[in-house]
């Protein structure tokens, strides 16, 4: 009997003390055996991970449910993977929406009127810091877009103070103090006639045009080429569109198209007014009208040349710029100068040869160093509110109190631009665009 029981227990059909079991063939035709990795019967639940009666103990490893461990581990891995994916998505979104800020965008300390007077008297007794005009190249770069480069050396120019009313003194309204133009109170200009003709017409004497430039960073090609819009400011917050400008994509040097049609900023558009073109280093810019370079009937005319002083030594200081304009006739019209005409010289060639008969040379007004704010300051009479390396005022050496043009920042993407005789809107807007462009060898 005992031998029979031992033989029976040794038969393949019985439960063995192992998880490897060779099952008995179910039929004679199926001679291949099957492997069962489990216990057969109630004993299965004792060793099974899914034992419903199992008591889990935190102290012993054997009391931890393997399924719970695997589930917890998988859940933790999934949460970690999800967190990593979210972090990568946030990083990509941050990079895609990230906009390079100006290095010079720093808090502005507004000087009160009595402090401004005291600072002015103190600065008048001290020697003013000289203008460093270096004519060489450096690798300091500019900021504005992903395609543009970053300024490293130019110091921001801060507004010197807020006047009770803009352009109240001789600097801007020509009131008689011995230095102004003697025009008395100036009137604010308005658009006369068609836009395309108005933007090319020199400003009348005694008229001031207050404008605003808005920078659209989205622009074209995912923000690599911002679009700039020029509006004439009117009362009660109203504004009139004048010009739009954008940088051309496929150009060896910086090349801006300027148009009076905001919906079509192309060279073939009906509203095409002119263009701004720079040299390789971004130190010299030439403004042209919409004339044809090859045409003899309506040749392309030079409207202005903007030259930024180069700086190889990295001196900290505001930008130094020179603007050369065509001279004015007795009836307040521009002298026609064309570098495309082989019979005459362009504005830049005339300036290099010191032939100043038919051209006018302007310079940016030298800012004054303020020891209290530790910055360069200019009085923009409330029109500029933020420090920026782009802030400037253009004057003529013979009359430094007559501000031909001023440009400066009021917010991250909004700038004010005011101009008067002898500039036109096209010239002033192009000068402002040159300030936005990257400059390899400046600052």
From Swiss-Prot:
InterPro entries: Tubby-like_C (IPR025659), Tubby_C (IPR000007), Tubby_C_CS (IPR018066). Signal peptide: none annotated. Residues 113-128 have a biased composition (Low complexity). One of its GO terms (cellular component) is cytoplasm. It is found in: Cytoplasm; Nucleus; Cell projection, Cilium membrane; Cell projection, Rhabdomere. Residues 177-186 have a biased composition (Gly residues). This is Protein king tubby. It comes from Drosophila simulans. The lineage of its organism: Eukaryota, Metazoa, Ecdysozoa, Arthropoda, Hexapoda.
